[in-house]
């Protein structure tokens, strides 16, 4: 139907006849001449119709925005002074000789070049229109390049692309499962996989050795800007490699991809223990572009009369930390400080104590804060420890350790972005030495990653001191976003049963949920491990998108709904009867 894409029309085609197909991006009448900006996925070409072509000109007068047309004409240079250097096709135009309307269009719900003023709900409702925008098509094209690059890299390194089941059974992986009722097995349900975790481990036990899959995964959880109920994961697993070797391969993949697709040379990824990341940055995925750090000051405040500080300072499960913002005392207004106080409240902080350092040499008189008089004896060593200078402001977090880390960690990131403190464009790292377990709040333990992560200690220590046991897990972080997480897996059945027992999963429950895995571990299991990338997050970062919804063709909203198809929706009662499902009305509170 066509000889060229619109974006291919350039000076090399001058005096040649071309046939183009696409959407009318814009139609203009200038002095009796009709101009059509014709758009396809590769670009926009200007087509000109003059009155000399009577029938064709009359047809061109009927054209409106978003009509789908086929045009044939001769390529010529634009008149002097009319070139558009902002377009790759801007030096030429097509003098139209033929025109065929392939499809008409209603008035669009929004102009494609005015999308900034259009609400996201409207864009998602008419996603097929939204995706016509060059910005959106370019993101999809780039995503395709990323997946192609990943496949080529892994194929070239001996990995085998293997598909794993979508209909499987529910396993405890941290989030709620999407359940699928079975028609043929009454009262039983499949679960959509949160990850291919167990199947890829079974593939290692099957001798596949190196596996990968670009897999759809599903989690029924509360959504944020970087979460979707269904998402795409680059899943990787290897046999007979330790964590350093796995990290080396996957780091090389990311660095090569950034170099070849973005012309960005990422540095070697530094490695940081989990405990250091939490202490210095309040996060297990720190954004190292921001030159602000948390500093422990609790040991300086154990004897002050101010219980807001001394209480947590004397509690082993609490923390008092300081966050110094250089020149922040000069930069921030009282209203801004109040706004940041409200912000940390989102994370459970009861307030945001601060000290403004006006003139350090004047001692207490050079400080501005309602708390200074309560901690006067500790002021000098405190200022020295945080490196305070004139003009600074020092914020404090004083609460349970988790609250302090989350509140000051989030404040650190917000200050970095609000005040444009980012020192570099890209800051990758590995976070390593994660704890195996964390308290579940009910006297038990839950796995930091998942129950199949190998510990870095023997079974005896794991059983005697689970609180201090470390895992052989590792997370790849870029600009404060977790790109991927992985670990060396347990390949010994006794160790696996021990971990499940510590997690409160008894022998009967373990057999019922994981019997197939426990059996497989007893038939010769190689040491193995792997990593999974979030493809959506990776493409979001590489394209500079604000949300993963911008790099997914048909995403869900934050309420897990498709605005275009109105999914999820009601189903025919007959289908429910076939599945032996009866809906119960939820009782409304009086």
Swiss-Prot record:
Q: What is the lineage of its organism?
A: Bacteria, Pseudomonadati, Pseudomonadota, Gammaproteobacteria, Oceanospirillales
What residues bind ATP, as annotated? 219-221, 228, 482, 534-537
Report the record's Gene Ontology biological process terms. Answer: aspartyl-tRNA aminoacylation
Assigned protein family: Belongs to the class-II aminoacyl-tRNA synthetase family. Type 1 subfamily.
Q: What is this protein called?
A: Aspartate--tRNA(Asp/Asn) ligase
Which residues are annotated as site, described as Important for tRNA non-discrimination?
Answer: 30, 81
Substrates-to-products reaction catalysed = tRNA(Asx) + L-aspartate + ATP = L-aspartyl-tRNA(Asx) + AMP + diphosphate
Looking up Gene3D superfamilies in the UniProt record yields: Bira Bifunctional Protein, Domain 2, GAD-like domain, Nucleic acid-binding proteins
